[in-house]
UniProtKB/Swiss-Prot annotation:
Belongs to the RtcB family. Binds 2 manganese ions per subunit. The active site is at residue 433. This is RNA-splicing ligase RtcB homolog. Catalytic subunit of the tRNA-splicing ligase complex that acts by directly joining spliced tRNA halves to mature-sized tRNAs by incorporating the precursor-derived splice junction phosphate into the mature tRNA as a canonical 3',5'-phosphodiester. May act as an RNA ligase with broad substrate specificity, and may function toward other RNAs. It comes from the Eukaryota. Keywords: GTP-binding, Ligase, Manganese, Metal-binding, Nucleotide-binding, tRNA processing. Mn(2+) 2 binds at residues 127, 264, 358. One of its GO terms (cellular component) is tRNA-splicing ligase complex. It comes from Trichoplax adhaerens (Trichoplax reptans). It catalyses: a 3'-end 3'-phospho-ribonucleotide-RNA + a 5'-end dephospho-ribonucleoside-RNA + GTP = a ribonucleotidyl-ribonucleotide-RNA + GMP + diphosphate; a 3'-end 2',3'-cyclophospho-ribonucleotide-RNA + a 5'-end dephospho-ribonucleoside-RNA + GTP + H2O = a ribonucleotidyl-ribonucleotide-RNA + GMP + diphosphate + H(+).
């Protein structure tokens, strides 16, 4: 393991960071040891201030405390074997395990030394967002907002340790892990068209349930169809602004005030255990294969090795679990709305607009240095954003580009964007995923009062149902960067395009 150069002053560190334009910065070789490619990150002035403040704090305490700023993590990823292009940080980047959250990197599958790293995916494999539209207007919902919020809260199990109500045994779980949304469709928890509007059509074909440990399966079995805690939520939202009416209409959005439901959840304890198991195995693989990294949290294995392949197959199975999970909650949300409005989900036009992953690694084809290459793209805290006419996006969105779902923080707006050709060439067809933390969870708990946060949401006209009220401080808007700045930076940088904005009217949290 190489040690970071902790003796440089803040001013000396700044010599390695160069502003390219108003929205992007280059990290030069030498910023951390062993960099094989340069780094790149996107930020406007307010976000830039947060990035550099983090670096300045790191320099002032001489790196003591184990905390690494996002820019250093971008540099450490740029030192990994087999990386191509650049190590890229998005505007919502913040410090994470191994990779920063909001850090993307691609590795050349043809290079026998290229690696896969669980830290480049995260512990909540396929944590992601699904957006469901309705034909309801805000005026239809407002008189019964509290009833609807309670109905959603009653239907969807939430919170730490919550247990699902989808009946499942060990055999069902193995089938769900391998079949993804095809299992949901077979069991009657999804509509056929839901799959069409889902990244990977809701199923990663390389999934192998045999690569999931018994402990991971035991954690996952009771949790299917549950929201969980932390930053996971189900929100009833109203369309607040439409920026691109052509693209919005292709998604069934045609007026301000139209009601949507956003579900944000992942692979629960199963995905966490898959990552934990893989990290243990990869630390041994690194010794065996002589792999050196700057940060031991970047534990990795050669893509082609047994350890690398086992992780990718297990990760794919965990991703399938997450898609089944969001499909199960879609089923429950449809039931809740149908019950409240005394009609059917079909009559309410409760169709899935799209479902995206924010934590995943996938083999894709991209142009690097003018040559088409097969790459393993790690997206951690970031969203795939493929452009118009890309073969992997649905027919409905061929003219507009892939919908990109950007969740805000509790009580703030969310956005839908679309993928662009510029994003395809600059960021491997990837953009931001949300607001990105500005305060650590511990600092948020120390500095905020949960009752004040809840009162402020109520004063804003937002109905809220929370399983663990004291966890609310961790997810308060003050704990995060401004999602509007993040989205605007991506839009102005050209890596994705604004389509419409959503405003919360009811929030369900763990």
């Amino acid at each position: 393991m190489e040690r970071l150069n902790r003796n440089r002053s803040y001013q000396e560190e700044l010599n390695f960071i160069e502003k390219i334009n108003d929205y992007s910065y280059r990290i030069k070789l030498g910023f951390v040891p062993n960099m094989k490619v340069e780094g790149l990150f996107y930020a406007d002035l307010p976000l830039e201030h947060l990035m550099f403040e983090e670096l300045q704090h790191f320099c002032s305490c001489n790196g003591v405390g184990g905390f690494l700023p996002g820019v250093k993590q971008i540099g450490n990823v740029a030192a990994l074997p087999g990386i191509v292009g650049k190590s890229i940080g998005l505007p919502d980047i913040h410090s994470g395990y191994g990779f920063a959250i909001g850090n993307i990197a691609a590795f050349d599958v043809a290079n026998p030394k290229a690696i896969v790293s669980p830290g480049g995916v995260g512990f909540d494999i396929n944590c992601g967002v699904r957006l469901i539209r309705t034909n309801l207007h805000e005026r239809d919902v407002n008189p019964m907002k509290e009833t609807l919020a309670q109905s959603l809260f009653d239907h969807i199990p939430v919170g730490v340790g919550s247990r699902g109500i989808i009946p499942m045994n060990a055999r069902d779980l193995d089938e769900a892990l391998e079949m993804g949304m095809d299992w949901s469709l077979r069991e009657g928890y999804a509509w056929a068209e839901d799959k069409e509007h889902c990244e990977e059509y809701g199923r990663m074909l390389q999934a192998d349930s045999n690569k999931i440990s018994l402990r991971a399966k035991k954690r996952g079995l009771p949790q299917l169809g549950t929201l969980g805690a932390g930053n996971h939520y189900a929100e009833i939202q109203a369309v607040d602004e439409i920026y691109d009416s052509f693209a919005a209409k292709s998604m069934g959005i045609n007026r301000r005030g139209q009601i949507c439901i956003m579900v944000h959840s992942g692979s629960r304890g199963l995905g966490h255990q898959v990552a934990t198991d893989a990290l243990f195995n990869m630390e041994k693989a690194m010794i065996k294969d002589g792999i050196n990294v700057n940060d031991r949290q970047l534990a990795c294995a050669r893509i082609a090795s047994d350890e690398g392949q086992n992780y990718l197959k297990g990760m794919a199975a965990a991703a399938n679990y997450a898609w089944v999970n969001r499909s199960s909650m879609t089923f429950l949300a449809r039931q809740a709305f149908a019950k409240c409005f005394h009609t059917t989900p079909d009559d309410l036009d409760m169709h899935v607009i799209y479902d995206v992953s924010h934590n995943i690694a996938k083999i894709e084809e991209h142009v690097v240095n003018g040559k088409l290459s097969t790459l393993l793209v790690h997206r951690k805290g970031s969203t795939r954003a493929f452009p118009p006419h890309h073969p992997l996006i649905p027919v409905d969105y061929q003219l507009t580009g892939q919908p990109v779902l950007i969740g805000g923080t509790m009580g703030t707006c969310s956005f839908v964007m679309t993928g662009t050709s510029q994003g395809m060439s600059e960021t491997y067809g990837t953009t931001c995923h949300g607001a990105g933390r500005a305060l650590s969870r511990a600092k948020a708990r120390r500095s905020l009062n949960y009752q004040e946060v809840l009162d402020r949401l109520n004063a804003s006209g937002i109905s809220i149902r929370v399983a663990s009220p004291k966890l609310v401080m961790e997810e308060a808007p003050e704990s995060y960067k401004d999602v509007t700045n993040v989205v605007e930076t991506c839009h102005l940088a050209g890596i994705s395009k604004k389509c419409f904005k959503l405003r919360p009217i009811a929030v369900i949290k763990g």
